[in-house]
Amino acid sequence: MFSTLLAVFIGGGVGSVARWQLGVKFNSLYPTLPLGTLLANLIGAFVIGGALAFFLRHPHLDQDWKILITTGLCGGLTTFSTFSAEVVMFLQSGQLAAAGLHVLLNLAGSLLMTALAFALVTWVTTH
């Protein structure tokens, strides 16, 4: 039990710091598109897709590794709450196109990145 808590703690800490750094470095570049949030969500989606495929192929690995990557790292890195707040701020300021683009890029992009990583890791581990 302690090792699982430690895995979540370590992964979450690394993911949260990475998300914060992405926001610091990229959110100010385009005021109508918070790139740091988008990058955090796309990278997290790619990582979790690859991790799911990898752990399906390696079920013998300690589950704490899966928890560290999926729940910890990806949970700390990706950010639905920040994304939601940004969309609401766009809507409240009348920036409907920016809100719509932000929703489209985050949702469609995250689904695409998860599927892409899953397919890539599956292909790499079977060839």
Curated annotation (Swiss-Prot):
It is found in: Cell inner membrane. The keyword Transport applies. It is a multi-pass membrane protein. Na(+) is not transported, but it plays an essential structural role and its presence is essential for fluoride channel function. One of its GO terms (cellular component) is plasma membrane. It catalyses: fluoride(in) = fluoride(out). Na(+) binds at residues 75, 78. Its main location: membrane. InterPro entries: FluC. It holds the Pfam family CRCB. It comes from the Bacteria. HAMAP family: FluC. Fluoride-specific ion channel. Important for reducing fluoride concentration in the cell, thus reducing its toxicity. Belongs to the fluoride channel Fluc/FEX (TC 1.A.43) family. NCBIfam families: crcB (TIGR00494), PRK14196.1 (NF010792). This is Fluoride-specific ion channel FluC. It comes from Pectobacterium atrosepticum (strain SCRI 1043 / ATCC BAA-672) (Erwinia carotovora subsp. atroseptica). The lineage of its organism: Bacteria, Pseudomonadati, Pseudomonadota, Gammaproteobacteria, Enterobacterales.
